């Protein structure tokens, strides 16, 4: 726990989803001064950006920025390509078509740059190794490798102000994440998890993200108040 009179800055990657919102709440509970960062990268679920903006206001982040980048032209992902359908949930060990190449590397790089501007040595990201659909950039080994790179590649790093990338959800399943968030007062109806939510944030109910969310609430024995299309 940090001294409330001397808050330490942290950049929080905030998508507007369940995991990133819980991560922001955890950072706030640890008394970090939070700066939230979201991305408009051409994703189909544009409503999650509105969720991110609303959540940043509710948690009173010191600043919330939305960075506009285009990954649709260089990415063959169902999340960014209108010609590729988001598939229904399926149990598979293969990396799914919803994987966006290098997405977390790009997002963390922006967070790293902003953290240097803010003279900040802490970044929070809501990845986890259990309910992550097989994405390679959600693993602890990847995060550690990025952290090493960041401290070799930045002015702060070589001057001894070492960056720490916090992954408070890394070993939690969805039910544990939900329980943690509820204990911190999160209203999960404000979050958007679905890969193809409509403009009002209503979830499809059949994609991987929706199924993991449904299962999480079921296992947590908490009513799921998410608005689903099906």
Swiss-Prot record:
Q: Name one GO biological process term.
A: queuosine biosynthetic process
Cofactor binding note: Binds 1 zinc ion per subunit.
**UniProt key word ATP-binding:** yes
Please give the cofactor(s) recorded in the UniProt entry for this protein: Zn(2+)
GO MF terms held by the record: ATP binding; ligase activity, forming carbon-nitrogen bonds; zinc ion binding
Binding of Zn(2+), residues: 194, 204, 207, 210
**Reaction(s) catalyzed by this protein?**
7-carboxy-7-deazaguanine + NH4(+) + ATP = 7-cyano-7-deazaguanine + ADP + phosphate + H2O + H(+)
In the record, the note on similarity to other proteins reads:
Belongs to the QueC family.
Query: What is the stated purpose of this protein?
Result: Catalyzes the ATP-dependent conversion of 7-carboxy-7-deazaguanine (CDG) to 7-cyano-7-deazaguanine (preQ(0)).
Q: What's this protein's name?
A: 7-cyano-7-deazaguanine synthase
Origin species, per record, is Vesicomyosocius okutanii subsp. Calyptogena okutanii (strain HA)
> What high-level taxonomic lineage is stated for the organism?
Bacteria, Pseudomonadati, Pseudomonadota, Gammaproteobacteria, Candidatus Pseudothioglobaceae
């Amino acid at each position: 726990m940090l001294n409330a009179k001397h808050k330490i800055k942290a950049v929080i990657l905030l998508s507007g989803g369940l995991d990133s919102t819980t991560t922001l709440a955890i950072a706030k509970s640890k008394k970090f001064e939070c700066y939230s960062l979201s991305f408009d990268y051409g994703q189909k679920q544009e409503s999650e950006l509105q969720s991110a903006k609303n959540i940043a206001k509710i948690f009173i982040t010191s600043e919330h920025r939305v960075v506009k980048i285009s990954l649709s032209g260089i990415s063959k992902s169902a999340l960014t390509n209108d010609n590729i359908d988001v598939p229904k949930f399926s149990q598979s060990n293969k990396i799914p078509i919803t994987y966006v190449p290098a997405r977390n590397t790009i997002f963390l790089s922006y967070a790293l740059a902003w953290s240097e501007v803010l003279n900040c040595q802490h970044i929070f990201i809501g990845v986890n190794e259990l309910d992550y659909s097989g994405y390679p950039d959600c693993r602890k080994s990847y995060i550690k490798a990025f952290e090493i790179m960041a401290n070799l590649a930045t002015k702060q790093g070589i001057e001894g102000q070492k960056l720490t990338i916090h992954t408070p959800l890394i070993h939690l399943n969805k039910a544990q994440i939900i329980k943690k968030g509820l204990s911190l007062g999160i209203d999960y109806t404000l979050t958007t998890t679905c890969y193809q939510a409509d403009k009002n944030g209503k979830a499809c109910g059949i994609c991987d993200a929706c199924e993991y969310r449904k299962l999480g609430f079921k296992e947590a024995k908490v009513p799921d108040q998410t608005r689903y299309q099906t």
